[in-house]
């Protein structure tokens, strides 16, 4: 281990060495599902995303409980294949250091209005009785921003064209 540490320090002293990408990026790519790449592209192209928690309402918040945490529209907006896996995808992206769950809301009121009108949010509010919505946000970390810039194409028009050709050929 000491040799590896010494090697790292020696490489860091070499001003001629070019390290375009963090060494973890290769491993991270192998630990991502295709839907997670779509989610990252959504964050890279559209910025932070709205999230809400539905809680029971109690005076002074004493005894209030979270009925439905982390409700978002990230799955549909990213075009993921497995919508029910979005919470697991987000947890994995957080584990990898690519996204951050912020307690701060976005300044984008319409994003929350659309999110709060979704059936899963409305259902959670009904089940909570007197409900309170806590607005939050999810965003890329600086590490995630760099990862997306270096590893993910901004668009997949070429890939989508190939998929469309394959679909047309099979009919």
Predicted regions, residues:
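Eukaryotic partner-binding/assembly regions in large regulatory complexes
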Residues: 1-26
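Short amphipathic alpha-helical interface segments
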Residues: 17-79
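Short, amphipathic alpha-helical interaction segments positioned at domain boundaries
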Residues: 108-170
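Short, hydrophobic/aromatic alpha-helical segments in well-folded domains
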Residues: 24-28, 89, 143
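Short amphipathic alpha-helical interaction segments
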Residues: 76-111, 117
């Amino acid at each position: 281990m000491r040799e590896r540490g010494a090697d790292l320090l020696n490489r860091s002293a070499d001003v001629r060495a070019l390290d375009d990408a963090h060494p973890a990026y290769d491993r991270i790519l192998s630990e991502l599902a295709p839907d997670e790449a779509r989610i990252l592209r959504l964050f890279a192209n559209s910025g932070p995303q709205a999230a809400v928690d539905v809680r029971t309402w109690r005076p002074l918040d004493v005894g209030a409980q979270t009925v439905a945490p982390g409700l978002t529209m990230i799955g549909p907006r990213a075009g993921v294949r497995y919508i029910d896996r979005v919470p697991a995808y987000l947890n994995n992206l957080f584990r990898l250091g690519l996204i951050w769950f912020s307690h701060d809301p976005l300044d984008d009121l319409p994003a929350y209005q659309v999110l709060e009108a979704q059936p899963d949010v409305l259902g959670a509010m009904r089940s909570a009785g007197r409900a309170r919505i806590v607005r939050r946000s999810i965003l890329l970390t600086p590490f995630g921003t760099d990862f997306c810039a270096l590893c993910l194409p901004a668009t997949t028009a070429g890939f989508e064209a190939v998929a469309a050709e394959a679909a047309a050929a099979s009919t």
